[in-house]
From Swiss-Prot:
UniProtKB keywords: ATP-binding, Coenzyme A biosynthesis, Cytoplasm, Magnesium, Nucleotide-binding, Nucleotidyltransferase, Transferase
Gene Ontology biological process terms in this record: coenzyme A biosynthetic process
Principal place of residence: cytoplasm
Catalytic activity: (R)-4'-phosphopantetheine + ATP + H(+) = 3'-dephospho-CoA + diphosphate
Protein residues bound to ATP: 10-11, 18, 89-91, 99, 124-130
Cofactor dependence: Mg(2+)
Gene: coaD
This protein's name: Phosphopantetheine adenylyltransferase
Species of origin: Escherichia fergusonii (strain ATCC 35469 / DSM 13698 / CCUG 18766 / IAM 14443 / JCM 21226 / LMG 7866 / NBRC 102419 / NCTC 12128 / CDC 0568-73)
Subunit structure: Homohexamer.
Length: 159
């Protein structure tokens, strides 16, 4: 039986830190679903369709990754995808409290759903989509932090 994992997030936009996490997850699980949340309350810069397309291109080299947009409750989405593992990235101690709350809630809603926390490589440990967008808005060079297709899309959005 295949071990299916979900790596959810808003990915607005997907960064090299996200790519680092999903790449390592592909070595641990048979099938990884990169689940892109609609998250309208976060007022994303990119539409859900744009974020899905950007992530598909950025992960095309990873054969066991499927990119899917979703707007459902995570536990329901995981159940519908027949996934029993939820991948979450932890950049800093500050992330842990929030992620622990989410993990407990998801376990309450779907007891068989395990949360697995991965720390990004040191090179990406301070990167977030929000920070990258903020630096780019002020003409800072964010080339190093984004896949090339995402960098081009971000620069076009900000033009």
């Amino acid at each position: 039986m295949q071990k299916r994992a979900i790596y959810p997030g808003t990915f607005d936009p997907i960064t090299n830190g996200h790519i680092d996490i999903v790449t390592r997850a592909t070595q641990m699980f048979d099938h990884v679903i990169l689940a892109i949340a609609a998250s309208p309350s976060k007022k994303p810069m990119f539409t859900l369709e744009e974020r899905v397309a950007l992530a598909q291109h950025a992960t095309a080299h990873l054969g066991n990754v499927e990119v899917v947009g979703f707007s459902d409750l995570m536990a329901n989405f995981a159940r519908n995808q027949h996934a029993t593992v939820l991948i979450r990235g932890l950049r800093a101690v500050a992330d842990f409290e929030y992620e622990m709350q989410l993990a407990h809630m998801n376990r309450h809603l779907m007891p068989e759903l395990e949360s697995v926390f991965l720390m990004p490589s040191k090179e990406w440990s301070f990167i977030s989509s929000s920070l990258v967008k903020e630096v780019a808005r002020h003409q800072g060079d964010v080339t190093h932090f984004l896949p090339e297709n995402v960098h081009q899309a971000l620069m076009a959005k900000l033009a």
